[in-house]
Amino acid sequence: MFVSRLAASGLLLLALLAVSLDGKPLQQWSQRWPHLEIPPLVVQNWKSPTQLQARESPAGGTTALREELSLGPEAALDTPPAGPDGGPRGSKAAAAAPQRLSKSKGASATSAASRDLRTDGKQARQNWGRLVSPDHHSAAGGGCGGGGGARRLKGLAKKRAGNGCFGLKLDRIGSMSGLGC
């Protein structure tokens, strides 16, 4: 009977595993493996959360700061604002009127700053699209001629497109008259 080399080597390996290096048969482990005694894990007793005060939050008092900022600058300073009518003989109407911020500190200044920082505007997207695919004008369709794109060139782009290889102007269909560029 023919036994393949792979099966024969597998049987030989199994026979050798049953015999220790000394040539004696292996004993079954009646004892545990030798190891250090590790104490069991200690159960942690966590403290219950304490009652928070009304103006305190787990994040370290940010709620109190938020309340002070929402009340206005006089709450943050804990002093009444000194204005033109906030002197020693201030009227009741001036004290009852809410304090208004100047126009430079209003919503317009905030929106202008955020508008300058915005990078996803329509103009930025258009410029990025032209940078990514500069050969867009060579696609079919669009203008009066054969291969013009949907966008007509304006301004400096139109002037740049009109220049030939040696600074000579191209004719209307975009071919150089006999220069072979």
Swiss-Prot record:
Record PTM Pyrrolidone carboxylic acid, positions in chain: Q28, Q31, Q44, Q53
What sections of the protein cross the membrane? none
Q: Which UniProt keywords apply?
A: Cleavage on pair of basic residues, Disulfide bond, Hypotensive agent, Metalloenzyme inhibitor, Metalloprotease inhibitor, Protease inhibitor, Pyrrolidone carboxylic acid, Secreted, Signal, Toxin, Vasoactive, Vasodilator
Which cysteines does the record link by disulfide bonds? C165-C181
Q: According to the lineage, what is the superkingdom?
A: Eukaryota
Residue numbers covered by the propeptide annotation in the UniProt entry = 24-27, 41-43, 50-52, 59-159
Q: Which GO terms describe its cellular component?
A: extracellular region
Its primary localisation, in coarse terms, equals secreted
How would you summarize where this protein is expressed among tissues? Answer: Venom gland.
* GO function terms (MF aspect): hormone activity; peptidase inhibitor activity; toxin activity
Question: Which example biological process does GO assign this protein?
Answer: vasodilation
Its localization reads: Secreted
Q: Where is the signal peptide?
A: 1-23
User: Where does this protein have compositionally biased stretches of type Gly residues?
Assistant: 140-150
Q: Which InterPro entries match?
A: Natr_peptide, Natr_peptide_CS
> Spans of biased composition, class Low complexity?
104-114
Region Disordered: list its residue ranges: 74-150
| Family of the protein in this entry | In the N-terminal section; belongs to the bradykinin-potentiating peptide family. In the C-terminal section; belongs to the natriuretic peptide family.
Q: What does this protein do?
A: Bradykinin-potentiating peptide both inhibits the activity of the angiotensin-converting enzyme (ACE) and enhances the action of bradykinin by inhibiting the peptidases that inactivate it. It acts as an indirect hypotensive agent. Synthetic Cdt1a, Cdt1b and the short hexapeptide Cdt3 are able to potentiate the hypotensive effect mediated by Bk on the blood pressure of anesthetized rats.
| Record PANTHER family | C-TYPE NATRIURETIC PEPTIDE (PTHR12167:SF2)
Q: What is this protein called?
A: Bradykinin potentiating and C-type natriuretic peptides
The organism named in the record is Crotalus durissus terrificus (South American rattlesnake)
Query: Species lineage, top-down?
Result: Eukaryota, Metazoa, Chordata, Craniata, Vertebrata
